[in-house]
UniProtKB/Swiss-Prot annotation:
Membrane topology listed for this record: Single-pass membrane protein
GO annotation, cellular component aspect: plasma membrane
Alphabetically ordered keywords of this record: Alginate biosynthesis, Cell membrane, Membrane, Transmembrane, Transmembrane helix
Biological processes per GO annotation: alginic acid biosynthetic process; regulation of polysaccharide biosynthetic process
InterPro entries per UniProt: Anti-sigma-E_RseA-like, Anti-sigma_E_RseA_C, Anti-sigma_E_RseA_N, Anti-sigma_E_RseA_N_sf
Listed PANTHER family: ANTI-SIGMA-E FACTOR RSEA (PTHR38104:SF1), PTHR38104
Protein name per the record: Sigma factor AlgU negative regulatory protein
Keyword Ribonucleoprotein annotated: no
Encoding gene (name): mucA
Pfam short name (any one): RseA_N
């Protein structure tokens, strides 16, 4: 962009008639060109006088900060010796050891009451039944079911008589209801072959 075009765009920016693209161009050019910055400063002073605004003394803060940064010495670089890496490794190992010891101590404190309770409970010896496996069979016959078990108590027979009826009713009702659940897909093992 030519010098005259930049000054015209700068004048349009000062009159608040420039669009965003022109404003960006002027700001980018002012960042690189000190003469354009001084022109902008003069235009700003002329605008303030024409609008009868109070004028402040010229303060170029950006130039003062740039000069101060240029005069400042660069900070010294940290030495990268082998001891620095060993120190970091030692700190990491110490933190890891402290965490592991804390976890172990915490778990031991929780385990002590449980171990004390386990030591005071009496051990119950269960009788072991030795014999062949018992197979139970169910049939649809109206006659009495054949019981293969060794028990002859009548209080367990009602389970053997009613269980097939309950299973059959369950399968029929779950198929009728048509609900979307896992239970309709469960099959009774004794009714599957019928």
């Amino acid at each position: 962009m030519s010098r005259e075009a930049l000054q015209e765009t700068l004048s349009a920016v000062m009159d608040n008639e420039a669009d965003e693209l022109e404003l960006r161009r002027v700001l980018a050019a002012c960042g690189e060109d000190a003469e354009l910055r001084s022109t902008w400063s003069r235009y700003q002073l002329a605008r303030s006088v024409m609008h009868r605004e109070p004028t402040l003394p010229k303060l170029d803060i950006a130039a003062a900060v740039s000069a101060a940064l240029a005069d400042e010495a660069a900070p010294p670089k940290a030495e990268k010796g082998p001891w620095r890496m060993v120190g970091r490794l030692a700190v990491a190992a110490s933190v890891t050891l402290a965490v592991l010891a804390g976890v172990r101590l915490y778990n031991q404190n929780d385990a002590l009451p449980q171990m004390a309770q386990q030591g005071t409970t009496p051990q119950i010896a269960l009788p072991q039944v030795k014999g062949p496996a018992v197979l139970a069979g169910y049939s649809e016959e109206q006659g009495a079911p054949q019981v293969i078990t060794n028990s002859s108590s009548s209080d367990t027979r009602w389970h053997e008589q009613r269980l097939p009826i309950y299973l059959r009713q369950h399968v029929q009702q779950s198929a009728v209801s048509g609900t979307e659940s896992a239970l309709p897909y469960a099959r009774a093992a004794s009714l599957e072959n019928r």
